[in-house]
């Protein structure tokens, strides 16, 4: 069982769960499949945390021909409280099982949590700095060349989020 009677990423002793890679895959696909079952056509999906970081990969590769998601934009929030350690080395094979293109997976030859974010950023349309982040994340974002919102220090973040979201939403005349 991936989630029952568990903490988010590690046990009470701080040891990472060995199946975090599978949990992330299950979580990302579960979100998308739930959206499909509810017959929603989202304009925007906002991804938070490492566990959802594979959602952009699945949305843009596995579900890329689904008309329900053809105009969906993805924003990812980056936090500096990322996990140390690695995912299961077999994560690439698990993703290939879903016919995810190898070109999007090569970075996972080194299956770190930072590299999960690299994949997420490369396939996202925007990013929000949800906290003061590490310099290597800033470099990742510069390479991705996507819009950025830095809102971790502003108390009026609701308006900033809404204004940022507006950049990605379709014009409704």
Show where each model-derived region lies.
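Catalytic cores of nucleotide-sugar-dependent glycosyltransferases that transfer UDP/GDP/TDP-activated
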Residues: 1-173
């Amino acid at each position: 069982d991936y989630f029952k009677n568990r903490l988010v990423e590690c046990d009470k002793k701080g040891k990472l769960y060995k199946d975090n890679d599978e949990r992330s895959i299950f979580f990302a696909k579960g979100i998308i499949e739930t959206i499909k079952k509810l017959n929603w056509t989202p304009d925007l999906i906002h991804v938070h945390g490492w566990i959802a970081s594979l959602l952009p990969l699945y949305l843009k590769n596995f579900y890329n021909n689904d008309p329900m998601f053809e105009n969906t934009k993805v924003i990812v929030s980056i936090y500096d409280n990322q996990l140390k350690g690695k995912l299961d080395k077999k994560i690439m094979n698990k993703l290939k099982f879903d016919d995810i293109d190898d070109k999007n997976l090569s970075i996972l030859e080194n299956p770190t949590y930072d590299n999960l974010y690299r994949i997420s950023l490369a396939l996202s349309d925007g990013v929000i700095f949800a906290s003061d982040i590490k310099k290597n994340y800033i470099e990742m974002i510069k390479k991705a060349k996507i819009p950025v919102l830095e809102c971790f220090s502003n108390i009026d973040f609701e308006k900033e989020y809404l204004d940022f979201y507006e950049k990605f939403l379709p014009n409704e005349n």
